[in-house]
């Protein structure tokens, strides 16, 4: 990944600093301190002690350096997960969308992953139980990506994978579109949001849901190749549509911060 885009909202972000939330961040923007460079160049920031400012200056300089070399794991460690969406623009080219199918049960009650779908904007691929799905193959498939996009993955997909495949690592920032939508007061599952934003699905799987995916797997276990193909198409649509939805929600979240208005006029 090359240097980040100049308009990326991450460089307007102060909520990555300990003790600064969205409210104080907006207060800082109102003082015409809009970027990390603005902050570090200011001799003082109202409401922040000189000692604290020196600490923040060091942290922002470090963040700037890590961003310039594309070290996304650094930001996964220092930022609250609910703010990981702010990194989407800079790491989109290194992002991978992930969606899993299961047999319908939790891991501690006989549950297991049937399919893991991965899409990076260029290629969709699948890891399938009994064929090529292992902790090693999943780690290899995730290797090199800098950013994770899921729908409800923070609560379901990632914990399920971690419980099912010890040794699998998710150390990169995670943009969970379900919680991003809720932040925007848009409720509902993935299919509802796709309909809301006009995102189309392949006709052969239109109307299918997670329970249908469970039933399809039952047929796959019996050797039904048509069911296997349908299950993979269903997962492919789930996974590929995440990137389209991420584009939409990122822009809405960015607009909701008000930063564009602050940048446009340089004031409140």
Question: Where in this protein do the model-derived segments appear?
Answer:
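Short phosphate-engaging motifs
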Residues: 35, 134, 156-157, 238-241
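Acidic active-site catalytic centers that drive phospho-/nucleotidyl reactions
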Residues: 99-101, 157, 176, 238
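N-terminal accessory regions of nucleic-acid-interacting proteins
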Residues: 1-92
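Acidic, Mg2+-coordinating catalytic module of metal-dependent nucleases/exonucleases
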Residues: 198-266
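Active-site catalytic pocket residues across diverse enzymes, especially alpha/beta-hydrolases
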Residues: 32, 165, 249
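Conserved RNase H-like, two-metal-ion catalytic cores of nucleic-acid enzymes
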Residues: 76-147
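Conserved DEDDh/DEDDy metal-dependent 3′-5′ exonuclease domain
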Residues: 115-200
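Short amphipathic alpha-helical segments
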Residues: 109-110, 161-163, 247
């Amino acid at each position: 990944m090359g240097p980040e885009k100049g308009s990326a909202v991450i460089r307007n972000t102060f909520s990555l600093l300990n003790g600064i939330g969205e409210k104080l961040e907006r207060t800082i923007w109102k003082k015409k301190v809009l970027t990390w460079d603005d902050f570090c160049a200011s001799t003082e920031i109202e409401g922040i002690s000189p000692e604290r400012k020196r600490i923040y200056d060091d942290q922002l300089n470090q963040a700037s350096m890590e961003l310039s070399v594309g070290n996304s794991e650094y930001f996964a460690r220092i930022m609250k997960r609910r703010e990981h969406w702010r990194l989407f623009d800079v790491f989109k080219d290194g992002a991978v969308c992930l969606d899993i199918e299961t047999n319908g049960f939790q891991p501690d009650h006989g549950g297991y992953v049937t399919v893991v779908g991965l899409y990076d904007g260029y290629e969709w691929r699948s890891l399938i139980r009994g064929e090529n799905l292992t902790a090693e193959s999943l780690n290899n498939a995730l290797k090199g990506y800098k950013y994770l996009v899921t729908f409800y993955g923070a609560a379901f997909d990632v914990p399920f994978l971690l419980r099912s495949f010890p040794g699998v690592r998710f150390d990169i920032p995670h943009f969970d579109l379900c919680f991003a939508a809720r932040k925007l007061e848009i409720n509902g599952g993935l299919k509802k949001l796709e309909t809301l934003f006009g995102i189309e699905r392949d006709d052969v799987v239109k109307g299918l849901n997670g329970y249908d995916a469970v039933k399809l797997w039952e047929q796959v276990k019996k050797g039904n190749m048509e069911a296997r193909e349908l299950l993979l198409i269903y997962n492919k649509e789930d996974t590929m549509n995440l990137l389209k939805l991420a584009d939409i929600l990122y822009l809405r979240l960015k607009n909701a911060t008000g930063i564009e208005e602050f940048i446009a006029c340089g004031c409140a």
